Amino acid sequence: MASPAIELRGVTKRFATPKGGIYTALRDLTLDVAAGEFCAVVGPTGCGKSTTLALISGLELASAGEVRVEGRPVKGITDGVGYVFQNDAVFPWKTVLENVAAGPRYHGAAGRDARVRAREWITRVGLAGFEDRYPHQLSGGMRKRVGLAQSLINGPRILLMDEPFSALDVQTRTLMENELLSLWSSTSASVVFVTHDLEEAIALADRVVVITAGPGTVKGTYEVDLPRPRNVAEIRFQPRFSQIYEAIWSQLRDEVLVSYERQKHAAAV
């Protein structure tokens, strides 16, 4: 059996607080993601979902346990990993073409080759004709398309996505979710997609992982046995979608309530 693309084994992550204390974001978290799998991660606010992505990417190192990507221990920034953040990560002073070409240029591509590849990806994400626009001249959905092109142009074997569509309106979000599935289907990348939206997680993923209220650990994993290719709007009306939703929500709801009670208590102190 092939090794997982991503392995987290008994991972704990602690941070120092400004007052000299210790905050534990993750505790004894174990998770595998297979090569080519689309894995969604859901959990209440503050459960360590984004921290998990940071550990996989090498932006943060585990306090205990082990993180491996493609069989190798993560000891720093991980090669072959793309990251799409919740907030726009475009350079405001660069055009769409310059933003998308920046990755290949950083990796040593000649300027002309980088621009040719950038134009190809700009077309693939539906932004042909906008190459010379600046980020402030684009809508939120268009900037997200730029972000996808920025990540995918580098051919990542692993794509990490941290609530990338959360700030978009419902209609644009649906379009972007379908766009993501279309682009992903043409690659062999493993995806770890963090979201607060359980419906989004089920519509996109092969498997949904539920994280407990912090310190986060895996509470359960659920296979999403819905056919592909999918239309994320239409798939929600299938009876099986509702069954999967109810099964996951029955576990996720308790963690959301725990997190909510903690927030109320903290606000009252």
Segments (PLM) and residue ranges:
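The feature captures the beta-strand-to-loop junction immediately N-terminal to the Walker
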Residues: 42-44
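Helix-to-loop junction immediately C-terminal to a conserved catalytic motif
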Residues: 57
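Conserved ABC transporter NBD signature motif
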Residues: 65-77
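Short coil-to-helix segment of the ABC ATPase nucleotide-binding domain corresponding to the Q-loop/switch region
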Residues: 94-102
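Conserved ABC ATPase "signature" region
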Residues: 105, 112-130, 182
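Conserved signature/switch motifs of ABC ATPase nucleotide-binding domains
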Residues: 133-136, 154
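Catalytic Walker B motif of ABC-type/P-loop ATPase nucleotide-binding domains
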Residues: 159-162
